[in-house]
Design a protein with these regions (language model features):
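Flexible "arm" and connector segments at domain edges
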Residues: 1-66, 70-103
């Protein structure tokens, strides 16, 4: 499982590296250069596509759209200068509590 987690770490590292690339040559740099609204719109779009795939019970499409969603979430985090550790720390703080909501 840890090698799978490392994939997420490498994804964010790649996004960080590409954030300074030429936006005409890097999709990641293009998204980041277009501002927070574009990043937010892409997360919204990919979340909706993931939900639609789930409604259709299309397992392969759920996996595909989930990967897109995770990528775009990472780009959004970068746009707001967040690191995966910020999110992991929040999740860790919720461990062992009733429900997922931090009250």
């Amino acid at each position: 499982m840890s090698s799978k987690i490392n994939t997420l770490i490498r994804l964010f590292e790649t996004i960080e590296k590409r954030s300074n690339d030429d936006p005409t040559k890097s999709y990641t740099a293009q998204l980041l250069s277009e501002g927070k609204e574009k990043c937010i719109a892409k997360v919204r779009e990919e979340a909706l596509e993931t939900v639609e795939a789930a409604e259709q019970e299309n397992i392969s499409q759920i996996v595909y759209e989930s990967a897109d969603l995770i990528y775009h979430l990472h780009v959004l985090w970068k746009k707001f200068d967040l690191k995966p550790d910020d999110i992991y720390s929040e999740l860790e703080s919720r461990e062992g509590k009733t429900g997922i909501k931090n009250e």
